[in-house]
Amino acid sequence: MKRLKEQLIETYNALNILLHEEETENKVTTATKLIVDTLKENHPFLICGNGGSASDSMHIAGELVGRFLKERKALNVICLSSNPAVITAWANDYSYEDIFARQVEAYGKKGGVLLGISTSGNSKNVIKAFEMAKSLNVKTIALTGKGGGKLSEVADILIDVPSNHTPRIQELHIMLYHYICERIEEILS
């Protein structure tokens, strides 16, 4: 059995790599600016993911529609992973692969942005959402594990963290999106 110390060292090592990657910092800064510009114009900031990434999507939306660290007005953020009626109706009648693309079609518009979270970067329904976003001139940001998988081919901005191990990827994701939420509030407050 892995000891807590070993697991913390794994996380520390992944974080240390991330800490020294200037390219990741530049991508996060660019993504944050894109999201801020979108929200300044009250265009929709859409977020999607499956499983733990769905939880992350809801977490981000909760922080930005509600508040993270500062009192401010609500922001136009929609989590595409959190409406079970829409998701199950579309998945049952059509295809699970299209559950996010259908919602992007409904809520996305030029000037908006879609954040797709996928540890592998290969979630078919997130990829299809990105394809729909492209057709609507909605910018896309992918938050993934190392390499970005197939999302790297369709994302406007790829933020891939330096790990292939799902728990470490998720730990790094939460650090990055908390940073993004904090910057958004700083700028828009």
Predicted segments with their positions:
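A short, well-structured juxtamembrane/interface segment
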Residues: 20-41
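Short glycine-rich phosphate-binding loop at a beta-alpha junction
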Residues: 44-48
